[in-house]
Swiss-Prot record:
Keywords of this entry: 3Fe-4S, 4Fe-4S, Electron transport, Iron, Iron-sulfur, Metal-binding, Repeat, Transport
GO MF terms held by the record: 3 iron, 4 sulfur cluster binding; 4 iron, 4 sulfur cluster binding; electron transfer activity; metal ion binding
Lineage of origin: Bacteria, Pseudomonadati, Pseudomonadota, Alphaproteobacteria, Rhodospirillales
Region (Disordered): 80-106
InterPro entries: 4Fe4S_Fe-S-bd (IPR017896), 4Fe4S_Fe_S_CS (IPR017900), 7Fe_ferredoxin (IPR000813), Fd_C (IPR022569), RnfB_subfamily (IPR050294)
Cofactor(s) of this protein: [4Fe-4S] cluster; [3Fe-4S] cluster
Superkingdom of origin organism: Bacteria
Binding site for [3Fe-4S] cluster: 8, 16, 49
Keyword ATP-binding carried by entry: no
Protein name stated in the entry: Ferredoxin-2
Length: 106
């Protein structure tokens, strides 16, 4: 299955969320994850990510946080300093385990 890698940390562009046919993205404070048990491996999210953060790695991190964070089904704003962080390597230590807001349905 596809998962989100460290390139997403401190960016969280969310273009991928809108194209996912099965709503398998979950939102943390500064990172998104894909629930690998829900992902159907269609790959439509991969080319949508400006940070090139979607790949076949990081499976366990995505599985862990998909169980803890709220589901996200609509695109929201990227983090304010996303462009500053987009191409920086070695962001794993910056990953916040705090949940994001998720998608609130009214």
């Amino acid at each position: 299955p596809y998962v989100v890698t460290e390139n997403c940390i401190k960016c969280k562009y969310q273009d991928c969320v809108e194209v996912c046919p099965v709503d398998c993205f979950y939102e943390g404070e500064n990172f998104l994850v894909i629930n690998p048990d829900e992902c159907i491996d269609c790959g439509v999210c991969n080319p949508e990510c400006p940070a090139e953060a979607i790949a076949g790695k990081w499976l366990e991190i995505n599985r862990k946080f998909a169980d803890l964070w709220p589901n996200i089904t609509r695109k929201g704003p990227a983090l304010a300093d996303a462009d500053d962080w987009k191409d920086k390597p070695d962001k794993t230590g910056l990953l916040s385990e705090n949940p994001g807001k998720g998608t609130v349905c009214h």
